[in-house]
Amino acid sequence: MANVLIRTTEGDITVRLYDETPKHRDNFLKLAEEAYYDGTLFHRVIKDFMIQGGDPDSIGAPAGKSLGVGGPDYTIEAEILPSLYHKRGALCAARQGDEVNPEKRSSGSQFYIVWGKKYSAGELRQMEKQMQMQQEQTVFNGLASKRRDMIMKLRRERDMAGLSALQDELLAETHAICASMPKPQFSAEQKEAYANVGGTPFLDGQYTVFGEVESGIDIVGKIQETPTGRGDRPTSDIKVVSMEVMR
């Protein structure tokens, strides 16, 4: 287990990297030791959500420049674990969306630190329902894609009865598959954290969480309050001055 001191123009943040996510841990340590992050900006900041950095293109970037696509020429295999979640202070890997990145591979350098908000028990229950509906939709879409040729044939023939029967068949298959899968839901620990500490539970299962803030959460809170402009970029630059690995 290793800690990294992130010195910023707003103050110091110390993060602890998880051994459960070794690919992300080792990559972050390597880049920190190479001074890769020195001079980069927190280029995307959203109040009550998160602060994002790690884009090398942000070094010396003029005001108004669009940022967020820079990084090394590799991505990192997802290490998404149910036990590591998006509580306030979680250190997570940014990534491209599912439409171009269905394997949820992480950016080689960009990261974000969660701020989020507190959620009531009712809000978390509603979120669980949405997660379960999303699981069913994902399974249904996967089954439908395998029957694409049949669906197109029935549509060409305008066979509404055939389409309806096929839909019923796919729905029955979907329900059977989902019944055999773990139901998406928050653990008691997650519920307590999201109710009492805060975070972004809707990101769980979608992004790799590979560390957490050990000290300096007040600095994260200060940064997420900063005024922003186009592209959620702070109107005044907030820089990573340097990083120091503390093993």
Model-identified regions with their sequence ranges:
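Cyclophilin-like peptidyl-prolyl cis-trans isomerases
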Residues: 1-247
